[in-house]
Amino acid sequence: EFLVQNDLTKSTMKLVDETEFKKLLSNLTIEETVAGGSVANSIVGLSQLGNKVSFIGKVSDDELGNKYEQSLVNEKVTYFYNKKKEDTPTGTCLILITPDSERTMCTFLGIAGKINEQDINEEAIKKSDLVFLEGYLWDEGEPKSAFEKAFKIANKTAMSLSDKFCVERHKDSFLDLVKNKLDITFANEQEILHLIGANSFDEVLEFGKDLGKLLVITRSDKGSVAIHKNEVFECESQKNLKLVDLTGAGDLFAAGFLHGHINNMSIQESLEKGTEMASKIIQKIGARLN
């Protein structure tokens, strides 16, 4: 009922401004406040698996920004950003969990939406095996220049398409990225169907084979699929799980898969590691494992 009243589509992410965000908050009781962010969740997962990782993002020198930075320090993530007092506050995401464990997100990007190429640490990217980006940030102007700078410097790039509506808004740009710039693309089934205008998953498989790069797709209870050149790899989802909160399922899946990829595991083993990580996170509240 709350979703309908506030024009929210279940299981998606809606961008809101600060006024709308505060209005939504005024009608709710907040159960818990935790650090998040799609790629940040993946990076923390990678750190917990023993990888050396760093994160480039943007927060303000305010209460939430300081908590956010400390959460990364606690997880042994090197954070490249000199935060300072800003008029724009740290970004915030309101996550609504319905009884079926689905999550619906309302995001006020705050200063995160103002990340620009000056915020990109060139040395950090040059030293990295791989740079992982999120499609969510394509929703604002300045981050595109930050993305472009990262693409030019990176040794290898991966990106999550993030959200079905995100794909709809930036279809041409995303398709160009997937075809011409990214080495690895992560998407769920709905996102990839929307991206290529497909009516069936068979069309997705054909697209993936023609792509010639690594395309990794999560299919909820149907498991996951990775397509690389002419090969298709599949992994079943884990059964009999106690679903609590689907927030971060894709983020932690990406963490597990990338852990396998950068540690020279096979594509099949990487899918299995991604499935294992996603299965753990959906059985708890929030998008980070303890």
Residue ranges of predicted features:
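Ribokinase/PfkB-type carbohydrate-kinase core domain
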Residues: 1-8, 27, 31, 69-84, ...
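Alpha-helix C-terminal capping segments
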Residues: 43-52, 96-98, 260-263
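Glycine-rich phosphate/adenosyl-contacting loop at the front of the ribokinase-like
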Residues: 1-54, 66
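Hydrophobic residues at beta-strand termini and immediately following loops
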Residues: 56, 235-236
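Short glycine/serine/threonine-rich phosphate/pyrophosphate-binding segments
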Residues: 37-42, 64, 89-91, 254
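Conserved post-catalytic alpha-helical subdomain immediately downstream of the catalytic base
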Residues: 48, 210, 214, 221, ...
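Short, conserved aromatic-histidine micro-motifs
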Residues: 15, 19, 63-70, 272-286
